């Protein structure tokens, strides 16, 4: 009988109250993003695996991959950022800079620094085609504003960031594999200062993988 109510490790339902809280947070995030001039894009939760093969970082290792009925190797969405680059790259056509946001579930084979759940809801934003320090600061300040929806006293830990005169920001040299990030990286913490609420950075080489010469910077919040 107990087995009828088990879920895979890292997956669980959200019932009425939790769903209502998530929707409220999502609505407030979307309002901030739209106010800052970001437009929404919607991405599939399933895609071919080949375009993401060999990406730096943990995208392949975190992705569920399987062969579909047509014999194609496909994967479930485990990271929005490469999917955004693949979707936007063919249609940029010099129409830059571009501000976009996205939201939806990601499904991973393993837990990440953003928490132990393998299925999580995320919402994030990118500025594409702007390599300036002003774009860096705009993204950092937007992330800080969104963090205040979840935390009374957020902290943004940055590595390689321009100087931001704001007590919410602290600089820290991060070690370890940067994955597809190429410069600035940052992590957003809530009041408990433990698991990051969000992470982001600059990935100026990612779009080139999909045929577009476009720098980009962005972040993703995980909303549990």
PLM feature spans:
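TRNA-binding/sensing appendages of the translation machinery
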Residues: 1-77, 82, 137
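Hydrophobic transmembrane signal anchors and adjacent membrane-proximal interface regions, especially
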Residues: 75, 156-158
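Positively charged, Gly/Ser-enriched RNA/tRNA-binding surfaces
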Residues: 18-36, 47-50, 81-94, 100-153, ...
């Amino acid at each position: 009988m107990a087995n009828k109510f088990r879920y895979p490790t890292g997956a669980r339902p959200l019932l009425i109250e939790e769903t209502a809280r998530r929707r409220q947070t999502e609505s407030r995030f979307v309002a901030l993003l739209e106010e800052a001039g970001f437009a929404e894009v919607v991405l599939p939760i399933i895609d071919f695996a080949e375009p993401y093969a060999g990406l730096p970082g943990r995208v392949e290792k975190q992705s569920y991959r399987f062969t579909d009925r047509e014999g194609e190797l496909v994967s479930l969405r485990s990271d929005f950022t490469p999917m955004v680059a693949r979707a936007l790259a063919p249609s940029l056509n010099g129409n830059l800079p571009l501000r976009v946001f996205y939201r939806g579930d990601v499904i991973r084979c393993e837990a990440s620094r953003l928490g132990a759940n393998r299925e999580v809801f995320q919402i994030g934003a990118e500025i594409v085609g702007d390599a300036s320090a002003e774009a860096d600061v705009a993204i950092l300040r937007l992330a800080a504003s969104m963090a205040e929806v979840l935390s009374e006293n957020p902290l943004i830990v940055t590595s390689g960031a321009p100087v931001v005169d704001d007590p919410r920001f602290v600089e820290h040299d991060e070690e370890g594999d940067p994955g597809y990030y190429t410069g600035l990286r940052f992590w957003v913490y809530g009041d408990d200062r433990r698991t990051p609420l969000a992470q982001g950075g600059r990935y100026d080489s990612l779009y080139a993988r999909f045929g577009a010469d476009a720098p980009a910077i962005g972040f993703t919040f995980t909303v549990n």
